[in-house]
């Protein structure tokens, strides 16, 4: 059984500039992968290649076994770009109907209404785009990306214009898509949001993969914090197996131990370190 997305040794050159160099990435059905990197890292180029909008210089990209850019592959993809624009005079329902026709979807009015309800626009289907907030337009973008029940969903900054309640709603939507078996590639600068929802993360910098794995795998141990009557004491070189000895030594020294916790780095810290290491190499 082929992966939802399989990228192998992907290379993209623009003249003498290497936008991507030997990038590998796979996403399985029902898996949500975060794509992280600074501006100019190559993220947008990678997504455009997956969509078939840009041809790679080398390597292989397939969507459920179909070469990227083929008609069969494009029919399996839903895409929400970071920058999008819908006609101001169109209503939400008209935008959805237009994209159904562009996608040659077999969906009907029922599909449109179900998707608008799914993204929280059930009561705004007759509202014109010009009267929508940026957050509502972003929800509409999510709705159009889901037309035709895509098996691979590419989301570029899907929560950037949403308030906290809207971001929670998107997280719940992503969980529902995961249950349905939809594969998702999520590009976002909101690392706290990414950390909450993804199964794996790939970090690229200057066109090269600098880190990949689950958030737990990428988190580096940062020692042990012990709370005593005198406050929190940090043991930077300690690991889990060192905790009993640390506690025993403190108790023997007459200290009262109230709490012990392992310290690990956040995804933001891992990201900053990976990008810094990649820039220095």
Residue spans for each PLM region:
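Short, surface-exposed loop and linker segments with low hydrophobicity and enrichment for Pro/Ser/Thr
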Residues: 1, 88-90, 135, 182, ...
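ABC-family P-loop ATPase nucleotide-binding domain
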Residues: 1-11, 277-281
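Serine/threonine-rich low-complexity intrinsically disordered regions
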Residues: 3-6, 70, 108, 185, ...
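ABC transporter nucleotide-binding domains
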Residues: 5, 12-186, 191-192, 196-205, ...
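Short, charged/small-residue-rich alpha-helical element at the C-terminal edge
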Residues: 215-281
